[in-house]
Amino acid sequence: IIHNDKIINSKKGAYHSNIHSFIFEDSVVVINDDYKILTDNMHYNSKNEVTYFFGPSLIISNKKTIYCENGWYNTKTDIAQLRKNSQIKTEKYLLKGDSLYYNKNLQYGKALSNVQLIDTLENITIYGEIAEYFESEEKIIISEKPILELLFEDDTLFMHAKQFFFNQNGDEKKILAYDKVKFFKTDFQGKCDSLSYDFTDSLVEMFNKPILWSDGFQITADSLQFLIKKGEISCVFLKPNPMIILKEDSLDYNQIKGKDMTAYFSNNLMSRIDVKGNGQSIFLIKDENTEDKIGLNYSECSDLILYFKEKKLKEVTYETKPISTTIPYQDIEEKNRYLKNFYWRGSEQPMSKEDIFN
């Protein structure tokens, strides 16, 4: 049939004039200038121009494909309400949900229950219960117990927050996580109030009391950024008020702080820390043979570089002459054990993917 700007074809059909309803079955095709519908069981009301789907159905437009197995689409208002395995697929991602509302004129969609946002190019999936889709802004907001899974070659990063924002502007792609962010990967974990991940350069930025754990080191600063390369942390940028702590035991902690710090990793292991401005450090000194505690070394130097191997300090390069003092272990007072603003937060570290919800 031809109705207004639509052509509808099928192998079988019937018309109920009293309710203005066409019934189409088997190889149903609806063609319009803006879209095409493919299904095997569809009812069409010629009065209100609403199509009803009963079975697997596709709505294909220029830049996206909408799929469902039950629902309706108002061809006059371009509003759809879809149920059962409903999804929107674009060139960039796939959005799934038990039910899906879509308004073409507002370029807005909403998915409810068992929501999944899948980006196969970046190997990322975000799960949740609600997703809002803003087509013109290329933005999707996922909420209600959302969890993000970022698949690397040998491992997966799991992240939880109250909300995830998935943004794409041309070739630029970002994920923003807001409120009570926690993430877990076997070789590094973190916690902060908000976070952004830029896929262009694999830069992660953490804000508001950020903390990162890797290779036994606790890494903190007012603002913390780190680069991911091949699924591993390659370097961490810290400023202001950075501090890196390595726990020796329940009593002693190796500590480094300064104005700006950059930490470098190799094969998931801390290899080097560059300190720029107001450098301070406390390190426990042990007997190389017996591992007995000899004392605590306290050093001050404006700029310094520390080299590590297997969590042990191997070498320190000072840019200027340092002020250094070693206190015999038996003479150490409690006040001398810690640098100013020392705060061990080991109890907050996620030890499994389940811990990101705690």
Regions found by a protein language model. Give the residues of each.
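Mature-chain termini and adjacent capping regions
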Residues: 1-358
